[in-house]
């Protein structure tokens, strides 16, 4: 009797599947048969059609469970394939840059930043670089449209200049050489993709193992406490290093500002000295011309040399030597020299 009841309750387990509706109907008809509440249940269990429906229901249920497991497994595989990144220890190669290409145009915002950054740093040297960038961004957003348009117009003109120069450059031989280099590099890159994929896959496995080893530590254990202490000590050391680097950076920034001020002062001194040298050079040329014209009628005793603008310096040296060597023999000549010098003083 209990086996008949058990066999009559099996079909409803597969009522959700399409292939089990017939078996459910068979069980229901067995329960409502006029011979008794369990009269046809035994018959349905021995019926081959019922057994076939039952096996079909089990097969459909197993296929549905496999499909659900496959759907759950697929996002994990996709997520695992998307995970990754650049392998540790590898450096991204910089893209090829054509040194012969025309200079890229600057936007209006970049032009404004370049113009105002140095002015703001000169006024407020203690402000860090990120704060200066933020302040300039706010200043740009509040800039009147007519002032902002000036930078945008300059950017448009620079863009037109770049397009013209680029069009001319693309017709040169240097551009063709750079294009061939780029194509050769792309071919080499395609050969390295397989090795890069393998390295990425190995890195993913290594990362998973590390994550699993860290997250598998049970909490509230001695191992977990030691791990937490090690992490806290590492964080303290990093904070300490960060503070030291910030202090060094601030000291270097002050040193740079002081050096910049000293350089500016030296540049001002150099300009002043150059102007002073120019004035002295002009005065020296004027004095040479005056001496040449004054002593043009006074040849040196013994040699008879007459001064010119080019030889006035050597003439004056020899004149001085003659006066000191024989002052008694050249008294008349010395008196004439005194008269000429007195006229120069006037």
Swiss-Prot record:
Compositionally biased tracts (Basic and acidic residues): 71-81, 181-210
Disordered: region residues: 1-112, 178-210
Cellular component annotations (GO), alphabetically ordered: nucleus
Coiled-coil ranges per UniProt: 228-272
DNA-binding stretch(es), residue numbering of this chain: 102-170
Modified residues (Phosphoserine): 104
Coiled coil as UniProt keyword: yes
SMART domains assigned: HMG
Skewed-composition ranges (Basic residues): 82-95
Comp. bias regions, Polar residues: 1-10, 55-65
Biological process terms in GO annotation: chromatin organization; negative regulation of neuron differentiation; negative regulation of protein sumoylation; negative regulation of transcription by RNA polymerase II
Subcellular location: Nucleus
Subunit structure: Interacts with DTNB.
Function: Plays a role in neuronal differentiation as chromatin-associated protein. Acts as inhibitor of HMG20B. Overcomes the repressive effects of the neuronal silencer REST and induces the activation of neuronal-specific genes. Involved in the recruitment of the histone methyltransferase KMT2A/MLL1 and consequent increased methylation of histone H3 lysine 4.
Protein name per its UniProtKB record: High mobility group protein 20A
Organism expressing this protein natively: Mus musculus
């Amino acid at each position: 009797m209990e086996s008949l009841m058990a066999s009559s309750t099996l079909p409803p387990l597969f009522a959700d599947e399409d292939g089990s509706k017939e078996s459910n109907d068979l069980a229901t008809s067995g329960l409502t048969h006029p011979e008794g509440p369990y009269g046809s249940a035994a018959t349905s269990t021995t019926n081959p059609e019922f057994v076939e429906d039952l096996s079909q229901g089990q097969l459909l249920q197993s296929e549905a469970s496999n499909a659900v497991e496959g759907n759950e497994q697929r996002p994990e595989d996709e997520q695992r394939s998307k995970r990754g990144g650049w392998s540790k220890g590898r450096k991204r190669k910089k893209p090829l840059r054509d040194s012969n290409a025309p200079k890229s145009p600057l936007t209006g915002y970049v032009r404004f930043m370049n113009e105002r950054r140095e002015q703001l740093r000169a006024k407020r040297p203690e402000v860090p670089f990120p704060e200066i960038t933020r302040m300039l961004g706010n200043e740009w957003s509040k800039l009147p449209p007519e002032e902002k348009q000036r930078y945008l117009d300059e950017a448009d003109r620079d863009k037109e200049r770049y397009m013209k120069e680029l069009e001319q450059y693309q017709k040169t031989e240097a551009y063709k050489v750079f294009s061939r280099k780029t194509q050769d590099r792309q071919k080499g890159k395609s050969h390295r993709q397989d090795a890069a994929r393998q390295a990425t896959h190995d890195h993913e496995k290594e990362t998973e193992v590390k994550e699993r080893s860290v997250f598998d530590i049970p909490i509230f254990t001695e191992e977990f406490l030691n791990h937490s202490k090690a992490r806290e000590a590492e964080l303290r050391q990093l904070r300490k290093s960060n503070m030291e680097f910030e202090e060094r950076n601030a000291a270097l920034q002050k040193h740079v500002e002081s050096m910049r001020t000293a350089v500016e002062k030296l540049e001002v001194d150099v300009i002043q000295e150059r102007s002073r040298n120019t004035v002295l050079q002009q005065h020296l040329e004027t004095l040479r011309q005056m001496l040449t014209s004054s002593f043009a009628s006074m040849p040196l005793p013994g040699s008879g040399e007459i001064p010119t603008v080019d030889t006035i310096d050597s003439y004056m040296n020899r004149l001085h030597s003659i006066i000191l060597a024989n002052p008694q023999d050249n008294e008349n000549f010395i008196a004439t020299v005194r008269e000429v010098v007195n006229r120069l003083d006037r």
